[in-house]
Amino acid sequence: MAPLISLQDVSKTYFNGDIAVEVLHHISLDIEAGEFVAIIGQSGSGKSTLMNILGCLDQPTSGSYFIEGENVSGFDSDELAALRRRTFGFIFQSYNLIPTASARENVEVPAVYAGVSARDRHDRAEALLQSLKLGERIDHRPNQLSGGQQQRVSIARALMNGGRVILADEPTGALDSQSGDEVMRLLRDMNENGHTVIVITHSREVAAQADRLIEISDGHIVADRSKKRRSNRDAAVGLAQRTREGFAAIADVSEAVKMALRALRANLFRTILTLLGIVIGVGSVVAMLAIGTGAQNSVLDRISSMGSDLLVVRPSMANFRGSAGGTNVTLVPADADAITELANVAFAVPEMTSTVTLRRGNIDYQTTANGTVPQFTEAKSWKIGRGEFINRNDMETYAPVAVLGETVVKTLFPEGSDPIGQYVLVNKIPFQVIGVMSGMGASAGGNDQDDVVLVPLTTGSMRLFGQRNIRTITVKVQDASAIDLTQERIQALLNERHRKDDTQITNMSSVREAFTETSNTMKFFLGSVAAISLLVGGIGVMNIMLVSVSERTREIGVRMATGARERDILVQFIVEALVVSAIGGAIGVVAGLSTGYAAKAFGMPVSFTPGPVALAFACAFLTGLLFGYLPARNASRLQPAVALSAD
């Protein structure tokens, strides 16, 4: 039968640029199952390199390595990880416990990567710690344990998956004599129970306790002496086979998240600073888009309230302001009557405006007077609140009647009395109040639409404005789909009537489209500014992950030594980045929503929609994935032997 371990003509060479350093020279060595072997040598003799090759932490430059007759020299990283997981248990001089994990969690690590269920892991880890007299220290972290206790935790970890072969690297080197003797007794007991034990040491006193002593010097085996042979392979094999192979549990998201949270809590302040970048980024996106969308919707609602089936006719700017040799204003009420006769025109509403002074009692108030016609409310989609609006009879009789806006009512009637039927002076002329308009609020330009007094067009022209020219004509069309054609007909009609092109027509549908396009551009700009904050947060995630990989290099080596595959390490660090981003994203969403509601409380228009919130959170998650991948990849590509030797 083939030996359990067999090295045939194995050499190991390290390269530093063009310089080659051969550490092991043509080593040939067989170790039978159940042996207790000590490999002794001084510092620099090559004993640690030999241990790394024996434990599949490193591969030989040349030669062959057989385990139970199978050549493992050409195994890839995943195959070597599986071999370490089911065959080897490691005990290190510096214990190499994960500082953020409890004693039980440290012991469970090999079983995590072997796919053992959580309950089975817990039970076996507790049983091993109990057997090593650490039952009261199960939930203690390494910094709460003595050196001897930490080494016993590492022994329990080595036995977690069965530990058919125990590789102990200077197991007593960091311990006092009493603790060292206890560790050697435990190694002897493990050998008695069928484990193959290989101790790497420079101490002849420690080596003397083994059944076989292999001495190495300058990369050569110079002595190989045996006191006796043991063969307890059946017990060792049986123990190792209890470990269930399968997918590595690190692939289980819940397990990966637990590991990530534990690691992030270890550097809480640094984690909070990193979270802050994500929170600011996501919060900015949510708040800015909510406020931007709210402002857009508010203005669009105001524009829509004017109707998308409206055309507004005004004098051209040159004629409106006056020009050399020209008249000031060219529109007259007859133009509105002519427009009404065109096809697809429902009605045309002429308006003239002027600033007037109102008086009631001892209250004087300056506002805008608007002379208009009965169709005004329909054209402006502005309902009468109380009383009645101007009618045709008022127009024909030049009636001195007025309809007030809410702002005017509050100013002239501060005591809250009913203004209907009462008289107010408009430029010292008495007008009877017949109605009050419903509140409209600010216009798209920010002007108070309720600060107005409405009078019949005929009355205003004759008694208030002293002119017959009108300021605007609002045209409502019957078929909005033909509004462009109607606009062309109106323009042609006015050009013919005035014998020149002295008017301009605004299509409210076009205004809405133009504003929508402009506001979308502004939203994109605001979103871009917020996205830059999110990008900065992503860079913070990458930074913390790169630092984390650097600080936890030895931990990565320990995980690989206990059976973690490259993709297990990759997944673990990506999950850590995603956890940071997800927590930051969630807090950022809450912060953004809170900011939006605070803005709303101060009267700002705010509109929350699920899309931007989900998008912001998804971007945070994607940021964690993108910026966490590079550090995670760097971690997964570390060589176990190199990672374990990191400071």
UniProtKB/Swiss-Prot annotation:
SUPFAM superfamilies assigned to the protein according to its UniProt record, in alphabetical order: P-loop containing nucleoside triphosphate hydrolases (SSF52540)
GO biological process, one term: response to antibiotic
EC number(s) per entry: 7.6.2.-
SMART domains: AAA (SM00382)
Cellular-component GO terms for this entry: plasma membrane
A Pfam family of this chain: MacB_PCD
Annotated positions binding ATP: 41-48
GO MF annotations, alphabetized: ATP binding; ATP hydrolysis activity; transmembrane transporter activity
Compartments where located: Cell inner membrane
The ABC transporter domain, residue ranges: 5-243
InterPro entries cross-referenced by the UniProt entry: AAA+_ATPase, ABC3_permease_C, ABC_transporter-like_ATP-bd, ABC_transporter-like_CS, MacB-like_ATP-bd, MacB_PCD, Macrolide_Exporter_MacB, P-loop_NTPase
EC category: translocase
Quaternary structure and interacting proteins, as annotated: Homodimer.
Family from the record: Belongs to the ABC transporter superfamily. Macrolide exporter (TC 3.A.1.122) family.
Name of this protein: Macrolide export ATP-binding/permease protein MacB
Gene from which the chain derives: macB
